[in-house]
Amino acid sequence: MNAPLDQLADWLAGAEAVVVGAGAGLSAAAGYEYGGERFRRLFPDFAAARGFTDMYSAGFFPFPTPEEKWAYWSRMILCNRYDPIPRPAVFADLLALLRDRDYFVLTTNVDHCFQRAGFDKTRLFYTQGDYGLWQ
């Protein structure tokens, strides 16, 4: 048996409500890596032209024209908000743990994965916005 997981299961079973705090690690576990092979596959032109190595730091680049800036950001949002979740089971498994409970999720994630996995949007607070709103 796994003592920490058993303890967590006991806590969940006895809880009146559950508050989940979720950050970038959960999205990374679901396959949203902002660098590495995924970045090279999705942004080869920006990597070659600008020397970018990941999506996060590229977002701070002072693009010389609005066209180039929005070419980058529209693709970044498409890949991280609208394309299928690479490993959707991460969010589906969490929802299965919470489904019949009084829960609330506080997240810094902007990728809309909670909503796309079926979480009730009235039980979510995404403090850093939502790519779907171009925030």
Task: Please annotate each region the language model reported.
Residues 1-135:
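Conserved catalytic core of sirtuin-type NAD+-dependent deacylases
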